[in-house]
Amino acid sequence: MIELTKDNFDAEVKESALPVLVDFWGPKCGPCMALLPNVHKLAEEYEGKVKFSSVNVSENRRVAIAQKVMGLPTFLFWKGGAEVARISGPDVTLEKIRENVEALL
């Protein structure tokens, strides 16, 4: 997974040739930490088809604010330089993440 910051967000997400999943998380977010190993497994499964990336909001608040992330966990799904889907809070399940990744293909 690619760690995103304000310096590389545009290049890695908006300008990506591949569809992109962006995982907004925080070290004190229990649900975020619980999902992390499964998201890493998905990243391996979809390697070469979908780019998986993450934003630690504790270290990159500006990125979270710019993307209007209001709670954690939040997953954004980008394709062709635009956000096409978003799931956050209690709506975030591994199944929902997988559904949205499949929709990017």
Locations of regions flagged by a protein language model:
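A short beta-strand-turn-helix
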Residues: 2-20
